[in-house]
């Protein structure tokens, strides 16, 4: 009997996450450090110097019936050898509509469309050569997942819900993930 209640509560929490007001636009500068990990003394540590990329991004929301669509662009600023590589993404509010993504390759002066996987296969590729996939960059739709509240916990002295998100059978065919665990700040 408690299981459906937890599922309903988890879905309501995720709806609040998606509905939060994050403004009609955003400008940011981000540093992304990635490395190959190895296990050492029961801990994961970088096996080499991290690869560091700095990029700037701009996002703008556009009102549509029932919500908003978003357009964003990201440009690599560092390292110098990759400066000017860009990523453009359109996210759509409409359920079932995939994001559109393009990559600008500065050295070639060319734009390449990043093709979504077909309806029966996930999208492949990594974002700016990191562990982050193009799927991770797309907007999430509430109905593409089922949710389960696993527990409440504390992270850095802040209360959190720990929620498992499992893709629906239809969405699972297009996803690289069988489930994800999300820590949601309760405030």
Go through each PLM region and give its residues.
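Preference for bulky hydrophobic residues occupying beta-strand positions
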Residues: 30-32, 74, 147, 165, ...
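A generic structural signal for short beta-strands and their flanking turns/coil linkers
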Residues: 70-72, 143, 178-180
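Long, terminal "pre-/pro-" and other extracytoplasmic accessory regions
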Residues: 36, 148-154
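Gly/Pro-enriched, hydrophobic low-complexity segments
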Residues: 100-104, 110-116, 121-138, 152, ...
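A short, polar/charged loop/turn motif at coil->beta-strand junctions and beta-hairpin connectors
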Residues: 22, 68, 141, 157-159
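N-terminal mature ectodomain segment of secretory-pathway/periplasmic proteins
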Residues: 5-107
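A short, amphipathic edge element
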Residues: 8-11, 52-54, 137-150
């Amino acid at each position: 009997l408690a299981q459906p209640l937890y599922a309903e509560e988890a879905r309501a929490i995720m709806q609040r996450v998606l509905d939060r007001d994050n403004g009609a636009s955003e400008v940011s500068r981000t540093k992304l450090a990635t490395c190959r990990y190895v296990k050492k003394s029961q801990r994961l540590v970088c096996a080499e110097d991290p690869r560091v990329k700095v990029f700037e991004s701009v996002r703008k929301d556009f009102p549509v019936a029932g919500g908003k669509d978003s357009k964003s662009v990201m440009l690599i600023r560092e390292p110098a050898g990759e400066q000017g590589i860009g990523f453009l993404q359109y996210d759509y509010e409409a359920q079932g509509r995939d994001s559109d993504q393009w990559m600008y390759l500065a050295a070639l002066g060319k734009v390449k469309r990043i093709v979504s996987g077909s309806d029966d296969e996930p999208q492949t590729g990594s974002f700016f050569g990191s562990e982050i996939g193009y799927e991770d960059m797309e907007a999430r739709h509430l109905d593409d997942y089922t949710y389960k509240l696993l527990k409440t916990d504390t992270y850095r002295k802040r209360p959190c819900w720990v929620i498992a998100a499992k893709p629906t059978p239809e969405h699972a065919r297009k996803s690289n993930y069988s489930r994800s665990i999300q820590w949601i700040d309760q405030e």
